[in-house]
Amino acid sequence: FRGRDAAAKASGLVGLTDRRGCCSHPACNVDHPEICG
């Protein structure tokens, strides 16, 4: 499950509390499609 592994790594970098903020920024959203879906 590479997608899930990528999501785990992304959430580690971005932080679960920052996910919504990341997804509101186009650059971060593009870098983390697995968490912004």
From Swiss-Prot:
The modification Cysteine amide is found at residue 36. Residues 24-26 are annotated as: Ser-Xaa-Pro motif, crucial for potent interaction with nAChR. Disulfide bonds join 22-28, 23-36. One of its GO terms (cellular component) is extracellular region. One of its GO terms (molecular function) is acetylcholine receptor inhibitor activity. It is found in: Secreted. The record marks 31 as: May play a crucial role for the selectivity for alpha-3-beta-2 nAChR. It comes from the Eukaryota. Expressed by the venom duct. Residues 1-20 form a propeptide. Keywords: Acetylcholine receptor inhibiting toxin, Amidation, Cleavage on pair of basic residues, Disulfide bond, Ion channel impairing toxin, Neurotoxin, Postsynaptic neurotoxin, Secreted, Toxin. Alpha-conotoxins act on postsynaptic membranes, they bind to the nicotinic acetylcholine receptors (nAChR) and thus inhibit them. This toxin blocks alpha-3-beta-2/CHRNA3-CHRNB2 nAChR with high selectivity (IC(50)=8.67 nM (on rat) and 17.5 (on human)). Also has weaker activity on alpha-6/alpha-3-beta-2-beta-3 (CHRNA6/CHRNA3-CHRNB2-CHRNB3) (IC(50)=108 nM (on rat)), alpha-6/alpha-3-beta-4 (CHRNA6/CHRNA3-CHRNB4) (IC(50)=121 nM (on rat)), alpha-3-beta-4 (CHRNA3-CHRNB4) (IC(50)=148 nM (on rat)), and alpha-7/CHRNA7 nAChRs (IC(50)=3000 nM (on rat)). Belongs to the conotoxin A superfamily. Negative results: does not block alpha-9-alpha-10/CHRNA9-CHRNA10, alpha-2-beta-2/CHRNA2-CHRNB2, alpha-2-beta-4/CHRNA2-CHRNB4, alpha-3-beta-4/CHRNA3-CHRNB4, alpha-4-beta-2/CHRNA4-CHRNB2, alpha-4-beta-4/CHRNA4-CHRNB4, alpha-6/alpha-3-beta-2-beta-3 (CHRNA6/CHRNA3-CHRNB2-CHRNB3), alpha-6-beta-4/CHRNA6-CHRNB4, and alpha-1-beta-1-epsilon-delta/CHRNA1-CHRNB1-CHRNE-CHRND. The cysteine framework is I (CC-C-C). Alpha4/7 pattern. This is Alpha-conotoxin LvIA. The lineage of its organism: Eukaryota, Metazoa, Spiralia, Lophotrochozoa, Mollusca.
